[in-house]
Amino acid sequence: MTEDQLEQETLTWLQDVGYTHRYGPDIAFDGSSPERADYRQVVLPFRLREAINRLNPGIPVAAREDAIKQVTDLGIPSLLSANRAFHKLLVGGVPVQYQKDGETRGDFVRLIDWAHPEKNEWWAINQFTIKGPHKTRRPDIILFVNGLPLVLLELKNPADENANIWKAFDQIETYKEQIPDVFQYNEVLVISDGTDALMGSL
């Protein structure tokens, strides 16, 4: 089995469990169905906005837009600190304030419907090009939930003795340095050679 075959097998399995497969070049800014403004953008803004609007109908539009801004611009230079801050927003909701009946009210905008998984949008995207500060990289598969890149999978050729899962681990470590923005939103990292697999976090 080649690395490409392993990637296709993985995508087939992901579709079997409910993910929608999208091909990275198709949803690029210059693709047939663009979902991002450029290769630097790691969140899919249209998907995120649609999900926030769908899951939070009782919160005013301006507050929902504020939540989107908070999520897409975490404003924290440290990767680990940004990742922790996003995790808090993902689990507990994004804090917002708005005026109602002459009073300032506080609420939380949900990014995911934890109680009803079927109400979320699950995408598995392969060959998703990301432009970092100095390098451009393309991880094998990224899993998006409501437009958020929560899981990154790096695969290696099971037939190549020199390309085991630890090579995939080294690749992810390189990605952290070269395309750090996508890791701000990461919840799970997966490495596999088709026989062995490991998962973890930052």
Residue ranges and their predicted role:
Residues 1-202:
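An alpha-helical interface "stripe"
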